Regions:
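Alpha-helix N-cap and coil->helix boundary residues
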Residues: 37, 58-60, 83, 87, ...
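Alpha-helix C-capping/helix-to-loop hinge sites
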Residues: 26, 30, 49, 72-75, ...
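His-Asp-centered metal-binding catalytic motifs of divalent-metal-dependent phosphohydrolases/nucleases
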Residues: 59-78, 84, 88, 92, ...
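Internal catalytic or translocation cores that form aromatic/hydrophobic pockets or channels
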Residues: 93, 98-109, 122
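Divalent metal-dependent phosphate-bond-processing catalytic cores, especially two-metal-ion Mg2+/Mn2+ enzymes
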Residues: 1-10, 28-36, 40, 44-56, ...
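An active-site-proximal "capping" alpha-helix that borders the catalytic cofactor pocket
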Residues: 41-44, 83-98
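Low-complexity intrinsically disordered segments
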Residues: 16-17
Length: 219
């Protein structure tokens, strides 16, 4: 996708190392275009958010790879039996290992992806981890959108359009939940699974309150 070959967007440099180019190629090879542009926006928004907080991102390459690959677990070739964040993190770490990234940096990428849906945790860790969390949160939920200047937002969306992201991403989440309903229990996607009619052992996906009430304790 030629959009990914831009040198910079909204004042954020797009890394063009061999590893970053390989990450783009991996993303493009099996992901729908709306997901590709989401991952690219995640990097731009996350970079701007971390910059505004004054936090450092020491490893730009690792941050870019984590942002680009953070939703791999939703794509059929990388789905296993875990919640999608873990499946995606595992796939990204395999990618890093294949490209001879050090174990420490591969672990950083893994954590950034595994924790990208963990409010209150990701922002307390390394800048690379916070970047993916903040960027994904802004693009998915609009968290911090009011802090993005209109001209900056316009440039980002011109370069990386949303392509009906909300509806298409929800459909992808539903498909993931239907593939593996057990992995959604006690995660933020459990309500998506319930609304989609997913069942576990013939019963609706339980809530946290139901699980606690059913625990084998008298009190």
């Amino acid at each position: 996708m030629t959009l990914a070959r831009l040198k910079s967007v909204a004042g954020v440099r797009i890394p063009d190392t061999a590893l970053c180019i390989a990450a783009v190629d991996l993303l493009e090879s099996g992901s729908p275009k709306f997901l590709c542009t989401h991952c690219l926006r995640t990097y731009i928004f996350g970079s701007l958010a971390v910059r505004s907080l004054g936090g450092p991102v020491a490893d730009e390459e690792a941050a870019f790879c984590a942002a680009l690959l953070h939703d791999l677990g939703l794509i059929p070739p990388y789905r296993r039996d875990n919640r999608f964040e873990i499946d995606g993190a595992d796939a990204a770490r395999d990618f890093c290992t294949k490209h001879q990234v050090s174990p420490e940096r591969a672990e950083l990428v893994w954590r950034a992806i595994a924790l990208h849906t963990s409010p209150g945790i990701a922002v307390r860790l390394a800048g690379e981890i916070a970047l993916v969390h903040l960027g994904a949160g802004l693009d998915f939920l609009g968290l911090g959108l009011d802090q993005v200047p209109s001209q900056v937002l316009e440039e980002i969306l011109e370069k990386y359009p949303r392509m009906k992201f909300k509806s298409q991403f929800r459909d992808l989440l539903v498909e993931h939940c239907q593939h593996n309903p057990a992995a959604q229990v006690l995660t933020w996607t459990d309500d998506v699974a319930r609304i989609a009619g997913c069942t576990l052992h013939g019963q609706p996906i339980p809530t946290a309150s139901q699980i606690m009430a059913a625990a084998p304790w008298d009190e």
